Amino acid sequence: MTKEHWSEVKAREVTEHCRKHADELPDEIVVASGASTSGRLHVGNARDVLTADAVARVLRERYHEDVRVVWISDDVDPLRRIPRDLDGRLSEDYLGVPYKAIPVGDEPYSDRWARNFVEELREFGAEVEWISSAELYTDNGFVKLVREVVNDYYGGGGRLASVLERFGLEDARVYMPVCEECGRIATTRVVDVDGWRIEYVCEGRHEIGDAVLEGCGHRGELDLRKPIEVNGFEIPPGKLGWKIEWPTRWVYLGVACEPFGKDHYVAGGSYEVGSAIAEEFFGFPAPVPVPYEWITLDGKAMSSSKGHYVTLSDWGEVCHREVLRYLVLRGKPLKHLDLDLRFGLLQAVDDYDELEKRYFAGEADERERRIYELSRVDEIPEECPPHVPFRFCAVVAQVVGIEDDVSEEEFERALEIFRRTGHLEAEPEGFGREWLRERLEKASRWVDRYAPEEARFRVREEPEPVELSDKEREFLEDLVRRLESETTKEDPETLQRTVFEAARTAGLRPADAFRVFYNVVVGKDRGPRAGTLIAAVGVDRISRLIRGCLEASED
């Protein structure tokens, strides 16, 4: 029996959750996601949204057509460190200031990152409603909930305090005012609360990121309903602390499900505290959780502040968008995912291609079918694309000389190689033709930006002499005879075996044989898989280079 895909399990849980707390399903089911706009938003941030999108897709298909997916940008949080992208262009004076009040050009720092990210998400098939947390704090309904929270806590009501004390959070910053004098939110504390009025002071020393900030000493009053101006931008007068703000959002938006990083799911973490506040203080059921593991890049955590990340746009330039969705959604959200944009990307495309072929051949089981359908950015095509391996396209792109966009002449030369090597079962038309062109362009960019040195090459125009031992010469002579044999097929696997057989006949170690071969053909000790290279370049040209080298090396 095939196991269900995790998205189907979660969609059913969400439906049962909604029915448990009401007689019938709500008019709309809300699935939330979000991120702090502390810097350039990347693929790691996208796992949150793609997970939400997967649950929403299954909900719409099976249970409820009206599903709302919201993405909240945490833009009232304080700047903790200067991102490497803006190092030298953003003053450290902005440390501790809300993202929404930091100017980058003519717009707030946070809007720049959030807008780009939402546009990228749409390109990857995730339609979300972008909600700025700053805008939430100007909404009358949300502000009323904020008033209820701060008046209970600072006014001695005791309901919220009793929950926080249970988790050892007696000294939590429940509300964080923005100082009207210095613009910082990281250096203030509440002195008194009376209805809508907040009295605060900006004082003390506060560690934030790698810096220590000192309050400016200003004492002032704020109205929870009225925005203030900081650096030319209207922003909320303050915000709730994260562990209190999160459940307040759930209540206001009616959230039924939310994915989030696994760090929030530990005992005493944000989700457990938030659930207690939602249920005990507001009387609202905590949403169905979908904790997920972080996506790493080359084994390290992605970080916009440290410049170690890859964006959705970066990925889309060098690989199909569906492949990233496939990588994120095929396994359970808590499964570790490390991105390797070198050879790991090639394997990822191979795996996706294999799934796609199984899907169209009717060989995929129900779980595999769900994975493929969730991986799609657009509608499922009517026919299976012509699956010329991405790694072969990367070799062909270099043989043909493609750089970024593919000209019609380059495309026809590439098609001729695909035909000669048996990679095309039928002549591509329409969708298939454009799909192949796109794959060639992406493969070319991958070579330029991420391919390891051994995957990059330039085939010699003319033969050149190479210093050869007797065994190496014997190997090359036997190899060229085999290649010129009428029985030789120009498919990569057959050609790879041919190289191994010639090496074995000459009594040469495979590593030494390949080193000699690459020196003859591309002038380096290493290169792409030999069989693939021979197939792409063509047996005739390879044979000419080998024979020419043998002759030149005799002199």
UniProtKB/Swiss-Prot annotation:
**Which cysteine pairs are covalently linked by disulfides here?**
none
- What Enzyme Commission number(s) does the record list for this chain? 6.1.1.6
Listed under GO biological process in this entry are: lysyl-tRNA aminoacylation
Catalytic activity of the protein? tRNA(Lys) + L-lysine + ATP = L-lysyl-tRNA(Lys) + AMP + diphosphate
Q: Which Pfam families match?
A: tRNA-synt_1f
- List the PANTHER family hit by this protein, alphabetically: LYSINE--TRNA LIGASE (PTHR37940:SF1)
According to UniProt, the name of this protein is Lysine--tRNA ligase
Species the sequence originates in: Methanopyrus kandleri (strain AV19 / DSM 6324 / JCM 9639 / NBRC 100938)
Which gene underlies this protein? lysS
